[in-house]
Amino acid sequence: MGAPSVGDVVVIPFPYSDLSQSKRRPALVLAEAGRGDFLLCQITSKQYGDLHALPLKESDFLSGGIKRDSFIRGTKLFTANEALILGVAGHLTHSKLSEVVSQLIDILSACLKDDTF
């Protein structure tokens, strides 16, 4: 498999937040981080009460797709090496990718509004 592209939805062993285990999950490629590493964002079928979770539907894919409507969780990011990527499930439309990036900017900008920073 070749290197993934920004906007690809890949399948990867995604770690639980306590790093005790991992589960095969789709993840969105947000950026190339150099040396074969990529910044990824978790995609899950459950919203988990996450106020930042963006809905992901079949119509949000330019090509390919995933089995069910899901959520992109902008607060669940991690860096993974290309060797961990098990495959590419699809590629998002430009408009959906733009929505995700805009939301990430909002999430990260919120810390600048905090007087303790």
Name these PLM-found stretches:
Residues 63-117:
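C-terminal terminal-subdomain/extension
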Residues 20-23, 29-62:
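Compact nucleic-acid interaction/catalytic patches
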Residues 26-27, 75:
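Small/flexible residues
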